[in-house]
Amino acid sequence: MVTIVLGSQWGDEGKGKITDYLSQDATLCCRAAGGHNAGHTIVHDSVTYDFHILPSGLVSPKCINLIGAGTVVHIPSFFKELGALAEKGLVDADKRIFISDRAHVCFDLHSVVDGLEEAKLGGRKVGTTGKGIGPCYSDKAARRGVRVGEILDEEVFERKLRNLHSGYRNRFGELAYDVEEEINRFKEYRQKLKPYIIDQLPFLQKYKNDDRILVEGANALLLDLDHGTYPYVTSSSTGLGGAIQGLSINPTKIKNIIGVVKAYTTRVGSGPFPTEQLNEFGEKLQVTGREFGVTTGRKRRCGWFDLVLCRYSLAVNHYTALNLTKLDILDDFDEIKVAVAYKLPDGTRLESSYPADAGVIEKLEVEYVTLPGWKSNTMGLTKYEDLPENARKYVEYIEKGLDGVPIKWIGTGPAREHLIIR
């Protein structure tokens, strides 16, 4: 059976921690989509690990890991990340990681183009990570991309990369990029990569009767290309559909769909954010929550918990259980607000649907309920009954507001053991 972990808001919810926890019993951990624009931080045995393209299951010594067909892989980052894990003691990580030959290659060329495209947008920029993810997925959709498996065929690889470069030069003129230099780098990568590249389908068939398969979502539902706050989204399918598509999962084998929700809301980059607090509350959340992007280092925008957004996320992703993270960050608030409805400019009231038009979202009014804070330390608590009464009421209010989907896990700190299991 398969357990899928998905982000329910705009990313940075803390998916890595619950994935790390669940991977202790997993046989296989897979990334289905996205690239090295994602960022997860895991604290285990007082060691902090940062993950971008690699699955978090590598921290578990018995877990095999797969970067699936729906991903885009920046090869230098892949090896850099593996090296960083080895330096921190995960010396066998390189023996437990594989890449689908159908995944696409994200080149330095894509990063250069990403910057040029953002610059052209000016004030309407998306606020990408600048890692080249969008241009890489664009090349994939236009059927001119380079797949990981094609790296092994030197002639095909070099021809396709030169064609990509030529196409972008025709569009942008001279680029701050040397295609021959990149080709030479891949001469070294070619042999190094060979042990990692596999045909995904027969690889996964070996696990078809295994009940301990874990899928680690990247980014989050509101960044999904189809269901997110378009155009302020990433370029892949970040929801349930993307997990199934990117890994050829049998839907009847899915046992758990875990939605990870932060106890407040954050967003990196541009785009609408109805509950954003551009005041002392937002600043307090940012500072107390240490809200800086793992990938970019940018400050995250912060705001109150949004039930409307999460109800919409639930309707798209069909969560069977929830993981509420970073509850301890709210410890010092006198009052805590929760968004329960939106009021559109025409007077329409929304409780569980999310407007498709980013311009409409920017203009809506938010209806809040105000709940009392608990003003006591919850960091490191591991028993639900030990939470202050108002903290329990906050958890149960969110649970009730999300159709009673159980909040099975509650994060009370950064470490693996800082977790309440209900």
Swiss-Prot record:
Q: Does the keyword Oxidoreductase apply?
A: no
**Residues given in the record as IMP binding sites:** D12, E13, G14, K15, N37, A38, G39, H40, T129, R143, N219, T234, R298
GO MF: adenylosuccinate synthase activity; GTP binding; magnesium ion binding
Q: Tell me the domain of life.
A: Eukaryota
UniProt subcellular location: Cytoplasm
Got a GO cellular component term for this one? cytoplasm
What residues form the catalytic site here?
Answer: D12 (proton acceptor), H40 (proton donor)
* Keyword terms, alphabetized: Cytoplasm, GTP-binding, Ligase, Magnesium, Metal-binding, Nucleotide-binding, Purine biosynthesis
UniProt pathway annotation: Purine metabolism; AMP biosynthesis via de novo pathway; AMP from IMP: step 1/2
Top-level EC class: ligase
- Cofactor binding summary note: Binds 1 Mg(2+) ion per subunit.
Q: Where does GTP bind?
A: 11-17, 39-41, 300, 326-328, 411-413
- HAMAP family hit by this protein: Adenylosucc_synth
PANTHER family for this protein:
ADENYLOSUCCINATE SYNTHETASE
Q: How does it assemble?
A: Homodimer.
Q: What is this protein called?
A: Adenylosuccinate synthetase
- Organism expressing this protein natively: Talaromyces marneffei (strain ATCC 18224 / CBS 334.59 / QM 7333) (Penicillium marneffei)
